[in-house]
Amino acid sequence: AKKQLEIFSDEIIEFITLNNYVLIKTSPGFAQSISYYIDQLQMKEILGIIGGNDTLMILTSSNEIAEFVCYQLFP
């Protein structure tokens, strides 16, 4: 799944952490595919993912964990 995320890296426009969330803005039509591959990583730090058309939100347990998840996904 990590390899598939690398393939989609050009479609990720920006990402930020906000409290215990990671918000990722993508090119239109790519958020659900990217959220699927992030989910396939089965990171225990991720409590859930919601993907729309061009935005996805990752729920974690704390701000620190959200920053850790960002670092793991986008080194």
Task: Name each model feature, range by range.
Residues Y71-P75:
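Compact structured core domains
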Residues K2-C70:
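Non-DNA-binding regulatory cores of transcription-related proteins
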